[in-house]
Amino acid sequence: IRGRGLLCRACMKSQMASPVFSDVIAALIAVVNSRFPSIGDLLLRRLVLQIRRAYDRNDKPLLLAVVKFLAHLVNQRVSGETIALELLQMLLGEPTGDTVEVAVAFVKECGATLHEVSPRAFNVIFDIFRGILHEGRDLEYRCQCLIESLVTLRRSNFEGHPAIRPQLDILADDSEQVTHEMSLFDEIDPETSLDVFKPDPEFLQNESKYEQLKRKILGEEVTNEEEEEDEEEEEEEEG
C-alpha cells in the first residue's frame, strides 16, 4: 500500500498538534484500518515507540498527548486492550506524581472500554489506584484528588466520558474492524523507510488495482466496459 508511512506520520503530527481531536483522528484511522489493516498496524507500532520514548525521557506533556491517542484507538478497537493494561501497569509500578496523572488521564479516556472488554484486569488496576491512595506514597495532594475523582467517575460508569461519541461511531458493524494485538514491550520496527518516496517498477498494474479498489470502497459500480478499457490502456502502455 503506497503512502501508508506518510499517512501515519501525518496523523500522528496532527494529533500531537491538537490532542483535543484525538478521538476524531482515531475514528478516521478506524475506518482506514477496516479496509487496510497494515496502516493501523504501522500506526500502532509507531505510537508504542513514541510512548516508550516519552516515558524514558519523563516527558509528561508528550506522554499525556500520546496516551490520549492510544486510548481512543483502544476505544475504536484498532488496538487490543493488552497495550492499555501494560501501559497502566508500567505507569503505576513505581508511581510518581507525573505517572499517576498520566494514568488517571488515560483511564478517563478509555476506562469504559476496558471495563467492558477486560473487567477483571480493570478491577486489578483500580486496586492499585486505591493502594496508592491509601499508602500516600508521598504524592501531592492534587494527585490524590485525581485518583479520588477517577474512583467517583468509575462509580458513575464513566458518565460524560463515553468510549465513542455517537458522531464518531462510523463503522456499521463491529465485525468490520481489525483489532491489532501487540505488547508494549515487543521489539518493534517503525519502518521509517516507508516515509521516503521510492519508484514503483509496477506502477501501471498497481494503479489499475488501486482504481478498482477505490471504486469498490466508495461503492461505485464498475461496468464490464470500464474493466475492458482499463485492460486496453494497460496493454497500450506496456506496448
Regions picked out by a protein language model, each given a short descriptive name:
Residues 177-239:
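Extended alpha-helical domain cores of large, multidomain eukaryotic proteins
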Residues 1-145, 153-164, 174-180, 189-190, ...:
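Eukaryotic alpha-helical solenoid repeat scaffolds
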Residues 168-172:
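Conserved P-loop NTPase catalytic core
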Residues 150:
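Structured beta-strand/turn binding interfaces of compact recognition modules in eukaryotic regulators
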